[in-house]
Every structure is written in structure tokens, then in C-alpha cells.
From Swiss-Prot:
Mechanisms controlling activity: Binds cyclosporin A (CsA). CsA mediates some of its effects via an inhibitory action on PPIase.
SUPFAM superfamilies in alphabetical order: Cyclophilin-like
Keywords: Cytoplasm, Isomerase, Rotamase
Species: Schistosoma japonicum (Blood fluke)
GO BP, sorted A to Z: protein folding
Enzyme Commission code(s) on record: 5.2.1.8
Chain ranges of the PPIase cyclophilin-type domain: 21-177
Annotated catalysed reactions: [protein]-peptidylproline (omega=180) = [protein]-peptidylproline (omega=0)
Segments forming a coiled coil: none
Similarity comment: Belongs to the cyclophilin-type PPIase family. PPIase E subfamily.
Record-linked PROSITE patterns: CSA_PPIASE_1 (PS00170), CSA_PPIASE_2 (PS50072)
Domain of life assignment: Eukaryota
Xref: PANTHER family: PEPTIDYL-PROLYL CIS-TRANS ISOMERASE (PTHR11071), PEPTIDYL-PROLYL CIS-TRANS ISOMERASE D-RELATED (PTHR11071:SF561)
Protein name: Peptidyl-prolyl cis-trans isomerase E
Length: 179
């Protein structure tokens, strides 16, 4: 089968995409690792913000941060390491940064997207979709996807509620970049 130069380049670029991880604790029990691939080829600023918040190499980030809002059959939202309740957070670029583009879609389980409070208000809050959420396309910047640990996301989802309040704390006990 012939593969064009463009297709080869695309495959090579995708192999070089950064991968980051969260080790998840629910209540007092370690529940496993989520591995996420970041689309630095399409949304480099958004992907770099998330990567740097996973590594903590700017002196702040997701370590010990909670998922403050979990709605089954919708999403798990976290990333407010400032206030922990969904009202705070900051990016590596300062407080907020602009929507980079909306090329990637909320096409199903495991999609990683930026939470915001309107256009161009990205900080550190993000969510992991647990279903297709196409009504969010064009409003929230998708920047990656879960590539391993889907079962851990399902465990997180199971302690959520319709209101988003979690039955037990869901915490990122460790995080970083896989190299």
C-alpha cells in the first residue's frame, strides 16, 4: 500500500505529540492512571499550557488538584488549583488566554477540552468528555484525548451527580509528562 509523504509526515507528527498523565485518587483510594495525548500540532499554546500545568515546571499546576464538577454521561471538570471550586485558576500565560481555534471536535468519550466562562477566557480549568458533546463545538477548545485509563475516567464518573457535586473527593495525586 502506497502512503503519501503528507500521510507519513502526519503519522510521524502524531507519534511526537506530548503525553501527560494523572494518577487519580477517589476518596482515600488510588484508582489508577489516566494518560492523555495533547494535540500540540493543532493547538500548540493550549497544549503547552496543559502540559506545563501537568509537570508543574512553572511552580504551579495540577498536583493535588480536584475534579470539582462531575456529571455522569457528560463530563468530569477540574483544574481549579487556585480555589478548588470552579471559580479560580490561571494559565502559564497569566490569568486567561484566547481561544486558539476550534478545529478539533467534542466527538466522544475521552475528549479533553478547556472549560471557560465565555470567549477567550481559558485558564487552567478543563474537562474530560464522557460522551459526544457536539453542542460545545465552536465554544470550547479541544486540545487532546485520553489514550489510556478510560476505566479510571468511568470510576470518576460514577461518583458524580446531575448537579455536578461529587459524592467523594476526586483528586489528582500525581501528574506529569511521559517521555
Amino acid at each position: 500500500e502506497d502512503v503519501s509523504d503528507d500521510e507519513m509526515r502526519t503519522k510521524k507528527q502524531k507519534r511526537n505529540l506530548p503525553r501527560v498523565f494523572f494518577d487519580i485518587r477517589i476518596g482515600n483510594a488510588d484508582r489508577g492512571r489516566i494518560v492523555m495525548e495533547l494535540r500540540s500540532d493543532i493547538v500548540p499554546r493550549t497544549a503547552e499550557n496543559f502540559r506545563a500545568l501537568c509537570t508543574g515546571d512553572r511552580g504551579f499546576g495540577y498536583h493535588n488538584c480536584c475534579f470539582h464538577r462531575v456529571i455522569p454521561q457528560f463530563m468530569c471538570q477540574g483544574g481549579d488549583f487556585v480555589k478548588g471550586d470552579g471559580t479560580g485558576g490561571k494559565s502559564i500565560y497569566g490569568r486567561k488566554f484566547d481561544d486558539e481555534n476550534f478545529q478539533l471536535r467534542h466527538e466522544g468519550f475521552g475528549v479533553l477540552s478547556m472549560a471557560n466562562s465565555g470567549p477567550n477566557t481559558n485558564g487552567s480549568q478543563f474537562f474530560i468528555c464522557t460522551t459526544k458533546c457536539d453542542w460545545l463545538d465552536g465554544k470550547h477548545v479541544v486540545f487532546g484525548r485520553v489514550v489510556d485509563g478510560q476505566n479510571v475516567v468511568k470510576k470518576m464518573e460514577s461518583v458524580g451527580s446531575k448537579s455536578g457535586k461529587v459524592k467523594e473527593p476526586v483528586t489528582i495525586s500525581r501528574c506529569g509528562e511521559l517521555i
